[in-house]
């Protein structure tokens, strides 16, 4: 899938008829926009389209003036110059707009006191997020309350007292900022990893913003799990231009882009490929088209590409690629593994097709290996579940047992299987490629188990850098961090899908920066959530019968199992035709969809 088609896919998010609290926005759409947070508020000095509130309207009543002020506050240009026009001259000079940036919705402006020339209002709202330096969005949940005072000056109301920091109405924030992903490298240097940011400003300033943020590096929580070839003193020399050197409309329409880097250390061909992949996928994801002419101190960055790079030159690291297209859909049907085609289902050869006692299973990314959780059939207090591992068309061996084992999930290189055992222990099963021998090691999941009692779902992202989990019915994302000595830990878990409204039952990765969640609800049983928690989209519910008990996904298609069948949703269908369709051979039976991962 191309960045353009992915963007189009996301623009078709569906508004639920009976919306979740978090899905309801002033504009009526069931989500925040696509991506993480904006650039550090109060630090952006550039030309921008500007707020639609150019200056305070004459004769405005104080409560309406406050609402105009919140609207103007979403324009960060020149330290929120548009918003400062609503302040008295003295307060305008003192206001610390960079102290914080709080995103709220359902803003109430409540009168507290009012005289002929003084007025005080209480501002109450729902807090939904915080903007942090570097454009990082942190999802939050709670109430927000503050007081703002105004006074009459020259016949016009102006704000005379307000808290430090910026208050951003979510609907206005979404009109001003866009979510764009920076791309860093996984530890093995085999793919790029998204780090969503929110940026504002004109499209012709987007390339400069994104490359600057890329050079600054990943957010702190992600830093231990990724690499950045643009670190170590790399900077941009001169302005970023179109490929032919023109300085107007850079990054807009055709004409490509040229970036002259300086401070680039000596690199071999592979390192240059990784460097270019970070730059190209960051720009391509932001709808900045190539060719991408990359220079180092005025000379071609790589002599193989003197006229510029294209996305085809770094296609092996495409963050939108998926292995499921080549491996195909499988399913767990009545306890057995079957392959699924347009004409029906076929039991797979070997143990996994013959067994009748499997509860969940996972295919490796290349489709050659299988891990499954099987029912032991033994009475309590004996372990009820066994984790079976084997080749696709061969036998299987039990590698561990437990009272409960989550659906397994494979590491991207197919070398390890992850699962949660008994709700509170996360393990990795290592498999030697040559011999097939397995060993079980624990993962440090203390940061996750501190959040709740029971882990019921664990899914690794396709780049292997993040883990999506369900803990006590809530959705969390953690960073997969390799510690000194080779051990792994799940670090910095953060709640996403805040305000989900009903317990999460199942989840899976759709793209590298979105997950699909099935929840215990009949009105909107399936939603799509951004990794930074900034966005939640209601997926269509037509044809589904609650509860939806399982979900599996690729970049192009979601599959779910409800109480009577397995359904698929094609992300490329037109919005009016986008609904769940039954998968042949998986209707009227107990079945769960299975894609690689």
Curated annotation (Swiss-Prot):
Organism: Rhodococcus opacus (strain B4)
Annotated signal peptide: 1-28
Cell location: Cell membrane
Family matches, as Pfam families: Germane, Gmad1
Top-rank taxon, per record: Bacteria
UniProt xrefs under SUPFAM superfamilies: DPP6 N-terminal domain-like
Compositional bias per record (Polar residues), positions renumbered to this chain: 39-51
Keyword Ion transport: no
Protein known as: Lipoprotein LpqB
Covalent lipid sites (S-diacylglycerol cysteine): 29
Keywords, in A-Z order: Cell membrane, Lipoprotein, Membrane, Palmitate, Signal
Membrane topology: Lipid-anchor
Lipidation (N-palmitoyl cysteine): 29
Region (Disordered): 39-59
Family that this chain belongs to: Belongs to the LpqB lipoprotein family.
HAMAP family in alphabetical order: LpqB_lipoprot (MF_01373)
A GO cellular component annotation in the UniProt record: plasma membrane
């Amino acid at each position: 899938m191309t960045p353009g088609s992915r963007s189009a896919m996301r623009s078709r998010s569906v508004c639920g008829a009976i919306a979740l609290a978090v899905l309801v926005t002033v504009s009526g759409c069931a989500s925040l926009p696509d991506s993480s947070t904006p650039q550090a508020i109060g630090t952006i000095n550039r030309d921008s389209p500007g707020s639609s509130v150019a200056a305070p309207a004459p004769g405005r009543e104080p409560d309406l003036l406050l609402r105009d002020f919140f609207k103007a506050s979403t324009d960060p240009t020149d330290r929120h110059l548009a918003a400062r026009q609503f302040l008295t001259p003295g307060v305008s000079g003192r206001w610390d707009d960079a102290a914080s940036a709080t995103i709220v919705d359902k803003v109430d402006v409540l009168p507290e006191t009012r005289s002929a020339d003084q007025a005080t209002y209480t501002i109450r709202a729902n807090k939904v997020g915080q903007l942090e330096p570097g454009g990082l969005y942190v999802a939050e949940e709670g109430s927000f309350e503050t007081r703002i005072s105004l006074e009459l000056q020259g016949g016009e109301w102006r704000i005379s007292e307000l808290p430090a920091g910026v208050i951003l109405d979510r609907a206005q924030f979404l009109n001003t900022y866009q979510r764009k992903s920076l791309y860093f490298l996984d530890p093995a240097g085999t793919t790029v990893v998204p780090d969503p940011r929110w940026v504002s400003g004109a499209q012709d300033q987007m390339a400069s913003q994104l490359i600057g943020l890329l050079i600054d590096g990943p957010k702190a929580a992600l830093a231990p799990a990724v690499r950045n070839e643009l670190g170590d003193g790399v900077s941009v020399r001169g302005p970023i231009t179109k490929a032919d050197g023109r300085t107007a409309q850079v990054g807009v329409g055709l004409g490509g882009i040229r970036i002259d880097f300086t401070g680039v250390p000596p690199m071999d061909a592979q390192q240059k490929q990784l460097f270019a992949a970070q730059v190209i996928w960051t720009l391509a994801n932001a709808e900045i088209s190539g060719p991408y002419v990359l220079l180092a101190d005025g000379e071609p960055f790589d002599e193989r590409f003197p006229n510029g790079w294209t996305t085809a030159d770094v296609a092996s690291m495409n963050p939108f690629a998926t292995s499921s297209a080549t491996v195909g859909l499988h399913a767990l049907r009545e306890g057995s593994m079957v392959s699924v085609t347009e004409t029906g289902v076929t039991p797979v050869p070997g143990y996994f097709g013959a067994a009748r006692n499997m509860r969940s299973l996972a295919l490796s990314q290349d489709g050659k290996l299988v891990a499954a959780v099987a029912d032991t059939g033994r009475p309590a207090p004996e372990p009820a579940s066994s984790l079976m591992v084997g080749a696709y068309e061969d036998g299987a061996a039990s590698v561990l047992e437990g009272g409960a084992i989550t659906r397994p999930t494979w590491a991207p290189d197919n070398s390890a299987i992850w699962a949660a055992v008994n709700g509170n222990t996360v393990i990795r099963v290592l498999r030697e490629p040559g011999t097939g021998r397995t060993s079980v090691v624990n993962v440090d999941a203390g940061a996750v188990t501190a959040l709740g009692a029971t882990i019921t779902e664990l899914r690794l992202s396709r780049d292997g850098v993040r883990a999506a989990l369900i803990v006590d019915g809530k959705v969390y994302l953690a960073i997969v961090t390799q510690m000194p000595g080779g051990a792994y830990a799940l670090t910095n878990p953060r709640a996403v899908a805040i305000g989900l409204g009903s317990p999460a039952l199942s989840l899976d990765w759709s793209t590298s920066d979105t997950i699909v969640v099935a929840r215990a609800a009949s009105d909107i049983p399936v939603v799509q959530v951004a990794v930074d928690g900034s966005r939640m989209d209601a997926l269509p519910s037509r044809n589904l019968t609650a509860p939806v008990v399982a979900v599996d996904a690729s970049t192009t298609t979601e599959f779910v199992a409800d109480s009577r069948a397995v359904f698929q949703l094609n992300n490329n269908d037109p919005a009016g035709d986008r609904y769940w369709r039954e998968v042949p051979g998986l209707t009227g039976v107990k079945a769960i969809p299975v894609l690689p991962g």
